Amino acid sequence: MSELYDITIVGGGPVGLFAAFYAHLRQAKVKIIDSLPQLGGQPAILYPEKKILDVPGFTNLSGEELTQRLIEQLETFQTEICLNETVLDIVKSDDGFTITTSQAQHQTKTIIIAMGGGAFKPRALELDAAESYSNLHYHVSNISQYAGKKVVVLGGGDSAVDWALAFEKIAETSLVHRRDNFRALEHSVEELKASSVEIKTPFVPSRLVGENGKITHLEISQVKGEESQLLPLDHLFVNYGFKSSVGNLKDWGLELNRHKILVNSKQETSVPGIYAAGDCCSYEGKIDLIATGLGEAPTAVNNAINHIYPDQKVQPKHSTSL
């Protein structure tokens, strides 16, 4: 039988990393299980260079920097970390729970699920032969390589607006969105309108023109009208969001609401001893932000400790008094 842990955290993104660190402050024996080959979740893999604006105390923090700071914080303690392991099943046991993954079985007294939106892949651009072009991208890495290029960004949410603003500093940039209004933070939209980004609204991509495996032009068509334009480009970035999959979540006996785990004010799920924090959980008034998830993590940890040791107070000493 495998070693018994106090708290096993499913998910190694920002919320999972901070939950693990905080659990160590409560002197818990902690394990992290993640299906990805590295820690950090979406910020580390999908937008390592994108600036994150909703983490308190930082005005210019990238996904990579956030991940590195959280990992460095966690490295002050010994944490068992299991990567490339997909959770297949969770079953109640005498000591707590048995977690079966694609690699092993894990024994734990309590569980904190911090898996974000689950497995994720970008929503594809649905135009003929789109996937055959090498200069069509869904992620940005090493933004400096696009300096001096013609860049077209598709989308109207935070990622599209933020990337358009980032590219504008180094490249000739256009942003194409199907509506006149953007779904991004108001502050970012004001920056966009004051920038040199060429805003194309309300237009949708209608055709790709290319040669030798690369797109040379994007044809866009007016949503309600007959106008069309041909935009020259060197690189096309698609920011239509992500399709997420919660995998076997529905089979773990947890009450769900629209593919998210219902929790109470203790971050406790419908199964005693299992908690959830971050984007994977749901409650009335829930806002999906990294900052929100980081705040939910200590609540989940403290109540998990109280589940293990009912005689201990849920409210611990403040870290400043330790």
Curated annotation (Swiss-Prot):
Its EC number is 1.18.1.2. Keywords: FAD, Flavoprotein, NADP, Oxidoreductase. It catalyses: 2 reduced [2Fe-2S]-[ferredoxin] + NADP(+) + H(+) = 2 oxidized [2Fe-2S]-[ferredoxin] + NADPH. It comes from the Bacteria. Binds 1 FAD per subunit. The keyword Lipid biosynthesis does not apply. This is Ferredoxin--NADP reductase. The lineage of its organism: Bacteria, Bacillati, Bacillota, Bacilli, Lactobacillales.
